[in-house]
Amino acid sequence: AQYAGEFGPDALAIRHALQFPPEVVRRETTSGRWNDETVTAYLRRWAREAPDAIAAEAPGYPPLMFAQALDKSERFAAALAVRGIRRGDVVMVQLPSGPDFLIAYYAAARLGAVLSTLHMPYGPVEAEPLLRHARARAVICGPATEKLDLPAMYKALQAGLPKLDHVISVGPARHGVLSFADLVASGDCAALSGEPRADDPVLMCYTSGTSAAPKAVPHSTQSMLANPRACAPIYKLAPGDRVLSAPPFSHAFGIYIANLTLMSGATLICVPAFTPPSLAELLEQSRPTHAFLAPAHVAAMLHAGLLEGRDLSGLRLMIISGSYTAPGLKAAIEVELPNGKAIELWGMTETFAVLMGDPDEPAELRHGFIGRATPGSETRIADSEGRVLPAGEEGELEVRGCSVFAGYFDNEAANAGTFTADGWLRTGDLAVMNARGHVRMTGRLKDIINRGGVKFNPFDVEALIDRHPAVLQCAIVPMPDRVLGERACCFATVRPGKSLTLADVTGWLAQHQVAKLKWPERLETIDAMPLTPTRKIIKGELMKLLTARSS
């Protein structure tokens, strides 16, 4: 009722999903972790204090200065306002990481709209249900290419999406598609009224959907900014620093990096598209002081020898996150960083970064664990009955803190069981914590295989098979069995020129003294793993493939 006059019905529904428990609001506001600072406030600060400093740059784009970023984003926000986009409305963006994406993001934040993201590989099958579920009022996309005509795709979808009023493209205006550049140029800031509020929804990302359909995760400005603000001192970021973000801005991790860089007054180096050679070259040529990468980025460059002989002397800190980090990866990349260290970050779309390595800790801690709870976050390990476990015992990681979301939008089934009775988020990840709070991931609850009543976690077995000389990537999934209930099937992609048999796999595991009950009893080789846009293996797709091949 408090917001009924300020939000439309659909926007009000998203606002309703952001109802944090009163004790959470009290805890975070009293601590000062939640305050009134907004994305717009940070952008205005640096536009005022360092107008000609570079806010963002990307290959193929002119540099974007802080003053330009503020001016263009406010003009674009005004153009959206004139076209009926109001506070709480969803604006969906399908753009590569770069200045255009940031202008759209800053504009939505200034307007009080909710930014929702679509990954670049998405076509109509993936985009349509998310646009419908989000009740998107506008979508901003790239130009037509030989591979996919995004503006035409969205115009075709618009006929079946009555909420979708506007299709905006960074390409030329055509067929009822508005031009992003024209809107930025014509926007009149006099059309803007009011200021964004820090407790309003500002971002709604969809989970990667490794085992189920994507779920919508709304965040307020407070829950979105509290975490990078608390973590900034650990990174030792300052104006003049240069931050490379390989994770795409369509992912919550990419937005986290963009916010961290903005509030620090540093320069954001964007990566519009990833190939191992181009990323290796950008790491050298752009001279970052900090680089955020996914494990797949690092592993691909190391495997191909693409970093050998490159001058990475200016890189002080490499932060690895986004999926499972193989043992030895952080130590291996540090060999290429004469003046830098590698740490790991762990989080979820629902939480942002809640575990983080400390660059000032010894290598054995940085390399052997993800890290400890970030400032403003708490972690614990619980068993299947919800009992909190002592140090050293494996159980489910549970978290709470300043950046944990309030619940999924329009998905009561997903919300059921997400939080414990005392308000901790159940992550679904298995982990072990030592006496000092350092956490090491050991698997996913959903990946547990129940072989005749004996349950085992395939996580460590997968990590070992990944080290086989013939294996590029592997994943173990359960397969139905009439006698035992479940057995284990290993899917693997094989290195060029190599071959792999089940006997090779089991022999490798025997050589490394893995208990036979954990050995896979079937091997399926495939050309490529089904991956989310953030390069996580979609085990649900592998199980469908297994069913199809079995039948």
What are these regions (language model features)?
Residues 1-9, 82-83, 113-182, 496-498:
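Structural core segment of the AMP-binding/adenylate-forming
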Residues 35, 44, 52-106, 123-128, ...:
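Conserved AMP-binding/adenylate-forming core of the ANL superfamily
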Residues 36, 51-52, 169, 175, ...:
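Conserved pre-ATP/AMP-binding loop-to-beta segment of ANL
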Residues 63-67, 202-226:
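Conserved AMP-binding A3 loop
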Residues 112, 225-242, 250-290, 304:
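Conserved AMP-binding/adenylation subdomain of ANL enzymes
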Residues 122-132, 139-141, 291, 401, ...:
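AMP-binding/adenylate-forming catalytic core of the ANL superfamily
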Residues 263, 288-293, 302-365, 378:
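Gly/Ser/Thr-rich phosphate-binding loop
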Residues 372-376, 387-418, 456:
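Conserved ATP/PPi-binding loop(s) of AMP-dependent carboxylate-activating enzymes
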